[in-house]
Amino acid sequence: MSVDKMNQAILNQLRLNSRKTWQQIGKDVHLTGQAVAARVAQMEEQGIISGYTIRQDQLSRHFITVFMQNSEFTRFENFLRENPRVESAYKVTGEGCYQLCFIADTPQEVERFLDSVLPFGRCKVLSAIRCVK
């Protein structure tokens, strides 16, 4: 699954604004809209593009390290997959068992989520205060 320079240019355009039309992207990367659509479809088939999403305010992100206190890993991972506010979740080595990125609009949402994680283990939370990049 290699990505050539043209596909990389298309991916960069989609990262900047995934609502652009194929024609708009084509103009930016010097292809026709049809050629862009074909390349995007090919990247979807290859698994290079697996979905489209929105970016929410960076300061609503909370980085949570979970230290499991039981062996209910499968149940915990299913719990994470079912929660739409969990933007990403990684099983990690080093400090902790899982690293989560949780999106919340209010401190109360963070508190409710942490309360729901307690049956699985304890947490350490880092909250974004300013986006650097």
Label the model's feature ranges.
Residues 1-133:
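A compositional/biophysical signature of low hydrophobicity enriched in polar/charged and small residues
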